[in-house]
UniProtKB/Swiss-Prot annotation:
Gene Ontology biological process terms from the UniProt entry: selenocysteine biosynthetic process; seryl-tRNA aminoacylation
Quaternary structure annotation from Swiss-Prot or TrEMBL: Homodimer. The tRNA molecule binds across the dimer.
Matching Pfam families: Seryl_tRNA_N, tRNA-synt_2b
Enzyme Commission (EC) number: 6.1.1.11
Pathway: Aminoacyl-tRNA biosynthesis; selenocysteinyl-tRNA(Sec) biosynthesis; L-seryl-tRNA(Sec) from L-serine and tRNA(Sec): step 1/1
Binding site for L-serine: 227-229, 281, 380
The protein, known as: Serine--tRNA ligase
Transcription regulation is among the record's keywords: no
Length: 420
């Protein structure tokens, strides 16, 4: 949720953010009205309670002959207090609903526009030039015995797969390398739950316009997470953190689940867009004034991992209209995919400012000991999709694939060849 002080002091900035996202600026006016109504309801209830308290004192001091009339007045006042408190509770609920309907306020540097209006910040490496017709990752993966889409579909349906043999080792190697780098950079390694309560899923902002992407277990009213960002965001819900020594950094290793409800017909081949994958995700709690610097650090750690797998990539500043509701700014790292002759996302890192922490009531104490809302950030350190970039960029004319040196200790070989 956004800061209501910003809303009251500069509603035009919030309206501009909504327009930049391609969302309805009228939601800002609805929130302003709900905020005003709630404050009026609180004032009415407070005044009536004060009057009721004064009446109680008056009755205690009144002569016997006056008490009957005062008691009747007190009963009338009691009814009004209950009505005012009910109105206040209703106003609280209306304010909360209006507050949650609004996306985070984008930062000033975010590019305007939609999905195709990103800004390329840097291009790293050069796409390989093959003297043969390169294969796509699925053809390579199946020929090398790394993945089995057909049996994945037989067992679970479309967009499911088996990673087999060295394919499984390649994924485990990626995730273990990411875990090692995370720990070396001061992160606490976590294996979180992948089922969360509705309030945690809602708190991270995933039950808004992207709710259709989330798997819901109706009988248990639990949600399967699409990223370990969700349980890690809920880890310190309703707590006051000590950030005096610096940010709290966690790296979550989990399976992730996405319905891909809006992706019918897109990336149906291979493992680029699937319902289940594994990922190591960085998650940080920090103070709001340090959030932008921390965002740059997360990007730098992602770059370290991408350098380790030796693939060409670019960094983009995602446009406002393509941001998730909780992100105030997002950088994506996209690797070159030879079979598609384009770049595809491998990592994203988002600065969510105080949006998630306000929803989840995560605070810290400032230098005066006063509780303040924390800031949260997240970023990908490795995921299943990286296998696509590794196979396609490191393939050779004979159909084998070179294993990046950093992954050789995990995979057990420096070249992937078809099984004998």
């Amino acid at each position: 949720m956004i800061d209501l002080r910003l809303l009251r002091e500069d509603p035009d900035a919030v309206r501009a953010s909504q327009r930049a996202r391609g969302e309805d600026p009228a939601l800002v006016d609805a929130l302003l009205e709900a905020d005003a109504a709630r404050r009026a309801a609180v004032a009415t209830a407070d005044n009536l309670r004060a009057e009721q308290k004064a009446m109680s004192k008056q009755i205690g001091k009144a002569p016997k002959e006056e008490r009957s009339a005062l008691l009747a007045r007190a009963q009338e006042l009691s009814v009004k207090v209950k009505e005012a408190e009910a109105a206040q509770h209703a106003a609280d609920a209306d304010l909360d609903a209006a507050h949650r309907a609004l996306s985070n306020v984008v930062l000033p540097a975010v590019p305007a526009g939609g999905e195709d209006d990103y800004v390329v910040l840097e291009t790293v490496g050069t796409p390989p030039e093959f003297d043969f017709e390169p294969k796509d990752h699925l053809e390579l993966g199946e020929a090398l015995g790394l993945m089995d889409m057909e049996r994945g579909a037989k067992v679970s349906g479309s967009r499911f797969y088996f990673l087999t043999g060295h394919g499984a080792l390649l994924q485990l190697g990626l995730l273990q390398l990411a875990a090692q780098k995370a720990v070396a950079n001061g992160f606490t390694m976590m294996i979180p739950p992948v089922l969360v309560r509705p309030e945690v899923m809602a708190g991270t902002g995933f039950l808004g316009r992207h709710a259709a992407e989330v798997y819901h277990l109706a009988d248990d009213d639990m949600y399967l997470v699409g990223t370990s960002e969700v349980p890690l965001a809920g880890y310190h819900a309703d707590e006051i953190l000590d950030l005096s020594a610096g940010p709290k950094r966690y790296a979550g290793w989990s399976s992730c689940f996405r319905r891909e409800a809006g992706s019918y017909g897109k990336d149906t081949r291979g493992i680029i867009r699937v319902h289940q994958f594994d990922k190591v995700e960085m998650f940080v709690y920090t103070t709001p004034d340090q959030a932008e610097a921390e965002h740059e650090r997360l990007l730098a750690w992602e770059r370290e991992m991408l350098a380790a797998i030796e693939v060409p990539y670019r960094i983009i500043d995602v446009a406002a209209g393509d941001l998730g509701s909780s992100a105030a700014r997002k950088f994506d790292c996209e690797a070159w995919v030879p079979s598609q002759q384009t770049y595809r996302e491998l990592t994203s890192t988002s600065n969510c400012t105080t949006f998630q922490a306000r929803r989840l009531s995560v605070r810290y104490r400032d230098e005066n000991g006063k509780p303040q809302i924390a800031a949260t950030l997240n970023g990908t350190l490795a995921t299943t999709r990286w296998i696509v970039a590794i196979l396609e960029n490191h393939q050779r004319a004979d159909g084998s694939v070179r294993v990046p040196a950093a992954l050789v200790p995990f995979v057990g070989t420096d070249v992937l060849r078809p099984p004998a």
